[in-house]
Amino acid sequence: MRCASRSDELVFFVNGRKVMERNVDPEGTLLTFLRKNLRLTGTKYACGRGGCGACTVMVSKHDPVSRKIQRHFSVTACLMPICSLYGAAVTTVEGVGSIKTRLHPVQERIAKSHGTQCGFCTPGMVMSMYTLLRNHPQPSEEQLTEALGGNLCRCTGYRPILESGRTFCMESNSCQQKGTGKCCLDWGENDSSRLGKKNEICTKLFAKEEFQSLDPTQELIFPPELLRMAENPEKRTLTFYGERVTWISPGTLKDLLELKVKHPEAPLVVGNTSLGPAMKSQRQFHPVLLSPARISELSMVTKTSDGLTIGAGCSLAQTQDILAERIAELPEEKTQTYRALLKHLRSLAGQQIRNMASLGGHVISRHCCSDLNPVLAVSNATLNLISAEGTRQIPLNEHFLAGLASADLKPEEILESVHIPHSQKWEFVSAFRQAQCQQNALPHVNAGMRVLLKEGTDSIEDLSIAYGGVGAATISAHRSCQQLLGRRWNELMLDEACRLLLDEVSLPGSAPGGRVEFKRTLVVSFLFKFYLEVLQELKKLVKLFSVAVGADSRHRSEVSDQFLSALEDFPVTIPQGVQTYQNVDPHQPLQDPVGRPIMHLSALKHATGEAMFCDDIPVVDKELFMALVTSSRAHAKIISIDVSKALELPEVVDVITAEDIPGTNGAEGDKLLAVEEVTCVGQIICAVVAETDVQAKRATEKIEITYEDLEPVIFTIKDAIKHNSFLCPEKKLEQGNVEEAFEKVDQTIEGEVHVGGQEHFYMETQRVLVIPKTEDKELDIYVSTQDPAHVQKTVSSTLNIPINRITCHVKRVGGGFGGKVGKPAVFGAIAAVGAIKTGHPIRLVLDREDDMLITGGRHPLFGKYKVGFTNNGRIKALDIECYINGGCTLDDSELVTEFLILKLENAYKIRNLRFRGRACMTNLPSNTAFRGFGFPQGALVTESCITAVAAKCGLPPEKIREKNMYKTVDKTIYKQAFNPETLIRCWNECLDKSSFHSRRMQVEEFNKKNYWKKKGIAIIPMKFSVGFAATSYHQAAALVHIYTDGSVLVTHGGNELGQGIHTKMLQVASRELKIPMSCIHISETSTATVPNTIATAASVGADVNGRAVQNACQILLKRLEPIIKKHPEGTWENWIEAAFEQRISLSATGYFRGYKAFMDWEKGVGDPFPYYVYGAACSEVEIDCLTGAHKKIRTDIIMDACCSLNPAIDIGQIEGSFIQGMGLYTTEELKYSPEGILYSRSPDEYKIPTITDVPEEFNVSLLPSSQTPLTIYSSKGLGESGMFLGSSVFFAIADAVATVRRERDIAEDFMVQSPATPERVRMACADRFTKMIPRDDPETFKPWSIPIA
C-alpha cells in the first residue's frame, strides 16, 4: 500500500487549475495521471517510449535565477514522471482550446488544412506546434520542422500538417512555389494558362484568408502561485512513497549529496528518457529514485577563456541553445567542437526528448549509440564531479566510456557539469552519424573526429577519433591515432589510417545490432569524409599560411571538385507542392457538397482532443483490466502453466486460459489461446485480469510456463520451401505459350526479389472494452476494428451465445491499414471470456511492444523471375514465382496470394505469362491484411524485371515501361476486359507535369560532376484493381432516420478509420436529401443498427456504403415527394412535420447488393474486380554513396480519381498511402533474432517515415474526371492505390545506385532487396572502402538477426 500519509504534497497546475496530490505513485507518469486521474484523454497513449509524440503536452517552469518563465517546452507525457512536476504548469490539448468554447488558431488551422485523418496523432501535433508558438509566435520553417520532428503520423504523409504550421512562419505567409514567386494556392484561380480552363482546375484546398489570427496575449498565463513558489522555493526535501518505489526530491545540493551517500545505488532521474524505457523493457527496478530537478547549481553555465562549462542538469535542448549562442559570440576557429555537437543535437531524437533529457544523463548513461560522447571524448572534455566529500575532475576519455572503475564516478558522486574546451587554430573537429532515417532515429554508427595540425603545415600533431554504435559503449581509437602522429594529411596517411582503424575498431560477425559489414564500412567512410573536410579547410588556410605540400600527387593535399558534394549534409526542408483537382461544375448548387474539399467531419474534435477513441471511454463501474501472456518459444509443446504466483499478487482477480472458453477456441490451427503447443514467439497463451492495468501487466511476468522445444523450427521462406511447409495450395495464372516464347527471344535474365515485411503501426494500438449486461448474456463491445461484424461473430462462437446478444460499437479507429480487420476479433473474444467469467467489464489495451509482437503485418515476399525479351526491350515471355511468409496460421494469406497473382502484371501487356504464388507456413506470428493486399510486394517484382531488362538493353527503364505497357483495349491475364486509355493518360500527364525528360538530363549532368553523391529519377505506372474478388463482399446497408425537427441521423456499415468515410457519407446524404450537411449526423457504426456488415477494406468502403446511403435517402425523398410538390415553398422542417402528421415513415433502410465479381482459379478466368484505379508517379532522389543516406528531392503523382467525392480527403489518402509505401521500400525494416523473436517492437527500432522524409517538392494531381456509371457519382476508392507509387522512390534510388555501379565497372546485380535502407544502398555502392573491410565466413558465427524473406 502507498504511504500517502507520509508523502509530501505534490503541487502543480494543469490547464490553469491547481492539482494537489499526496497519493501519487512514483512509478506513475504524467500520461497516466492525466488520463486516469483527471480524465483528460486528449493526450494519447501510442508507444509508451517517447518515440511517437502522441502524448505531447507543454510544461512551463519559472526560473528563479533569471526571474523569467523558462522556455515553455514540449514533453512526452508517457515518460514524464508525475513526481517530477512539482511547481510546474502543464498544458494539455484540452487547455489550448475547445469546440465548446474557443478554438485556438493552431487547432483551427491543422483541421481546416486537412492535417488530420484518423486524428490519433493530432493532439500531439497540436501541442508541439502550440509550444513552438508560445516560444516563437512567428517561427522559422526550420524551427517548425524541428518542433515536429518527434511526432509521428501514419495517415497524412505530413504535408498538410506542415502546411498548417507554415501559415504561422515568418519567412512568408505563402509557399512562394519553387522559384515562381507565386503561392501554390493561387495557381488554379490566377493562372488558367498553366492549369486549363477557368473554373476547371483548382488547387485551393482551404481558405487561408478565413483563419483567425494568432494573438499571443490571449494565452493562458503562468499561475501566479507557482511564481511565488519559485521565488521562495521550498528548500526541504520532498518525498513521495509508492508501493514499491520512493521518490526523493531534495531542495539543496547539500541534501542531494547526503542522499547519495545514504542511497548510493539510487539513480538520478531528470528526464527519464533513458531510465524510463529501460525500466519498462529491461525490467529494471530501483526502490529509490533521486530527483535533482530543484537543484539550480546543476543547471549553471559558465563561460571562460578556455571553454564552456555546462551544468549536468541542463536539458539537451538548453545545451543546443547554449552552444548556438556561444558559436555566435566566438570566432569560428574556437567553435569547431561546439558546431560538431550542435550538428548532432539537431538530429538527436525528437524535440520532446531533447527537452526532457539532460546533458549529464546522456553522458553518464554511456549508451553505445550516444551522439554526444564521441565528440566530447575527442575534444578533451572533462567531467566535474561532486560528492559530500568534495569535488574532482575526470577526463571524458576511453577509460570513462569503457566504464573502468578507476575512471568512473564513485557511487556517492554525481556529475555536476561538463567542461568543453574551445578549439584552436589549426584544429579541426567534426561529427558524423548515419541512422535509418534523417531525424529521430538512433544512429547505426556515429563518430567524433579531431585533428590538430602543426601550425603552417599539414603534419598531424594530435589526433583523436571515437565511434559509437560499434561496441557496448563509445570506442576511442587511441592506438590508431597515436601511430598516425607526425604523418602528413594526405592519401598515404588515409590508407594507413583506414587499415589501423579497421584493426582497432573490430566488430565480430555476431555483434548486437547486426549490420556488421555496413558498420565497418562507415568506420572508414566517416574517416574519409573527415579527411576531405580537413583538406578543404586547409585549402582556405593556404591562402593565409604556407602549407608544406609534396610534389608527388600522393602527398598533395587537394580535394577534387567531383568530391566536394561529399562534404554537404542533406538539408532539412519543409516540402513545397501543388495539389490539383477538378473544380465542381459552376452550376452545382452551393449547398451540394459533393466534389468539394470538405474538412474531415471530426477534424476539429481531433485537434482539440475531444474526439473519443476506444480507450477514452470513461471507466465503467467494477471495470477490470486484462494483460496477455505470450509464448517465448517459436515451436514448443506446453508442459505446464503455473499461475499461482500471479494469483498471489494483490489486485489480481483471475487468469484466463483455454479451459475457460465455453465455446469454440478459435479455428483449427489458429487458437485464441494456445492449447498443448505454441507455434511462434508471441502466441497468446493466457490472460491476466486485475484491478489495475499496471498490476495485470506485472502479474504476467509471474506466470511460469514450461516448454519442450519441437522441430522443425522454420522462420525463412527458403526454409519453408525446403521443408515443403505451405499454408494453402499454389495459385497459378498463365497465358500464351511461355516455354515456346523463351526459345524465340534474343535474351533472357533470371533474378530474385526480396521484399521485407511491414508493421501497420497504426497510432492507436489494438484495444477493446467488453461490458457484460445483467441479463440474457448480452454484451456491449467497444472495439477499434475495421470489421465489427467479425468481432461479433467470433465472440458469439467463443462464448457459445447467439449473435443477437452481442453489440459491437465503433466510434472511430485510430488507423487500421488492414491490421484491424481480423486481429481485433481475437482480442475481443479473449476479453469477452474474461468478462463472462468474472462478471465484470474488461478493458484490454495492448502496449506497442505487444501489439507489434502479436499481430503480424505485411507479408514478406521472395520472388524469382525469368524474363525473355528482344534486343530493343520488348518482353516476349515472363515467368514469376512468388512466395510469401504467412507466419504460423492461414489468416488472410491465401487471399493475399490470390490478389498478388491477380495484380502481378501491373500496367503491362505481355503475351506469354506465367504467375505462381505460394503462402509459406513458418514459426512467426501470422501475417495479415495490409493496405494494398499483396500488390505492393508483387508489383515490385514486376517492375524489377523491367529495370533488369532496361539495364541489359542499355536503355532507360521508362522506355522499356512504355514499350511494354497496355496500348489498346485488351484482356488481362485473367481474361477481364480492360481499356488502358486512362492509364496512358496518367503516364503521359506524369511525364509532362514532372518535366521528366529534361530532369533526366539534369540528373545525368549532376552525376557527371559528382563522384560521391548521385541522383536518380524514376517514373512508375500503376493499374490497381479495387475491391474484393467476390460479389458478397461488396454489399452494404444503411439506416437513415429523419427526426421531427428535421435533423437526420445516418448509420451505415462502414467504419471511420481516418479515411473520411463518415464525411463522404454525409456529403452523399446532403446531396440526395438536398439539405445542408449541418442537418445530418453520424454517431457510430454499430452491429445493432446495421447488421451483417463487411469489413471496411479494399478501398470500396465509400463506394458501397455510399450507394446504400444514397438508396435510403432516395427512398425517404420519394416518400416526401407528394408533400414537397404540394408545398414547394415550404421548408425542410415543414415537410418533415407534415410527413409525421400524415404517418409517413421517416426511417429507411438502404441497401446495395454489390458489384459482381468472381474468379475461377481452375480455369484461370474471372471478373474479380469492379474497376481499376490508374496512376503514375515520378520521384527524384539524391544518395550519399559514402553513407547510404538519401534525400527525396521531388515527387509528382498523377491519380485517376474519376469524379472525386471530396478532393481534400482523396488527396490526403494518396499522399498518406504514398508516404507509407515509401516507408515500406526505404526505412521500415523488421528484424528477427535467430530464435524468431521480433527485435523491432517500438518506434526506437522500427522507423516509419517522419517529417523530414517527405519529398522537398510534393505534387499531387487528380486526373480531370471521367464518368463511370458503376460507382457512386462516378467516384473511385483511393485508399490503397498510392501505396505502390512509393516504389518510385525505391527505383529512383536504384537508378542512382546503378549509375554508381556503371561508373565503377561493377557488374549488374539482378537480386533486388527492399527496403533500400542506408545499409543496402551503401554496400551496393562498392568502392575502395567496401573492398578494404574484413568479411566473416557466415559459417563461423551466429548472426544477430536473420532475413525472413
Curated annotation (Swiss-Prot):
Keyword Metal-binding: yes
GO molecular function: 2 iron, 2 sulfur cluster binding; aldehyde oxidase activity; FAD binding; flavin adenine dinucleotide binding; iron ion binding; molybdopterin cofactor binding; NAD binding; protein homodimerization activity
EC class: oxidoreductase
Cofactor: [2Fe-2S] cluster; FAD; Mo-molybdopterin
Keywords noted in UniProt: 2Fe-2S, Cytoplasm, FAD, Flavoprotein, Iron, Iron-sulfur, Metal-binding, Molybdenum, Oxidoreductase
Binding note for cofactor: Binds 2 [2Fe-2S] clusters per subunit. Binds 1 FAD per subunit.
Reactions catalysed: an aldehyde + O2 + H2O = a carboxylate + H2O2 + H(+)
Chain sites annotated for binding [2Fe-2S] cluster 1: 47, 52, 55, 78
Localization per record: Cytoplasm
InterPro entries assigned: 2Fe-2S-bd, 2Fe-2S-bd_dom_sf, 2Fe-2S_ferredoxin-like_sf, 2Fe-2S_ferredoxin-type, 2Fe2S_fd_BS, Ald_Oxase/Xan_DH_a/b, Ald_Oxase/Xan_DH_a/b_sf, Ald_Oxase/xanthine_DH-like
Superkingdom field: Eukaryota
First-listed, main subcellular location of the protein, grouped into a coarse class: cytoplasm
EC number: 1.2.3.1, 1.17.3.-
Domain annotation 2Fe-2S ferredoxin-type: ranges: 8-96
PANTHER family: XANTHINE DEHYDROGENASE (PTHR45444:SF3)
Sequence similarity: Belongs to the xanthine dehydrogenase family.
Name used for this protein in its record: Aldehyde oxidase 2
Species this chain originates from: Macaca fascicularis (Crab-eating macaque)
